[in-house]
């Protein structure tokens, strides 16, 4: 898990929301019951990403293909490395990622504007 102080907010007894000092918001929608993802694991996820105005910009579901990456290896945006750590297989999280942990002031591919906060639903399918 990300080290540092965390603030826990419980608005619903079935949902847990954490705000990490970096500004990343993590909301467990489903807490899985499988193995827990940690740095160094190869993780397999399904995800959908939106801008804060509700515009969907990407989804692995639309391609019917999961996405795999090495957790903590810098292969993805920092918000994903921090936000997927600690998930358990079968779990689902909503990640609200500030621009500094996403694509920053450069944006991405004409799809994500500069300075954009990103919202992802991430489901942990597997790990090795």
Which residue ranges define each predicted feature?
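Cross-family detector of peptidyl-prolyl cis-trans isomerase
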Residues: 1-128
């Amino acid at each position: 898990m990300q080290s540092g102080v965390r603030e826990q907010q419980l608005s619903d007894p079935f949902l847990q929301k954490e705000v990490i000092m970096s500004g990343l918001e993590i909301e467990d929608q489903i807490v899985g019951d499988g193995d827990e993802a940690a740095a160094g694991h190869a993780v397999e996820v399904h995800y959908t990403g939106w801008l804060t105005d509700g515009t969907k910009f990407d989804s692995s579901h639309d391609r019917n293909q999961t996405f795999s990456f090495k957790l903590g290896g810098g292969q993805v945006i920092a918000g994903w490395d921090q936000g997927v750590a600690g998930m358990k297989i079968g779990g689902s999280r909503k990640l609200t990622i500030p621009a500094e942990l996403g694509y920053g002031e450069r944006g991405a591919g004409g799809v994500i504007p500069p300075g954009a906060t990103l919202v992802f639903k991430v489901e942990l399918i597997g790990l090795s």
